[in-house]
């Protein structure tokens, strides 16, 4: 019953997109099942609507926020921390060529926006995930 409603909703979105000369990209379309612990009762195969098909994913990205199956935000924090430390590693290659104040300004301008983006979805995270984000702030300072 519920799966047929989801399929009908996706079909309606695809029809609307077609009528507005837009195309649903099969390669970029993903979905997750947001349910209780009874996930084993959900279909694990993809759904097909016309030529469109999608399979359930363990993590999806929407507006730059990574949402995982259990809504724990672990994947979002992991990717954010990884991206920030990668930026810091790149900045360290020029550390000796620029004055300290310029380096600090660059680090602040290039790293902290990653932490600030969508930080309201991070409210109420476990302490372990907050510590990982704080380690980025400490490394940037």
Task: Mark where each language-model region is.
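Hydrophobic/basic alpha-helical segments
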Residues: 1-141
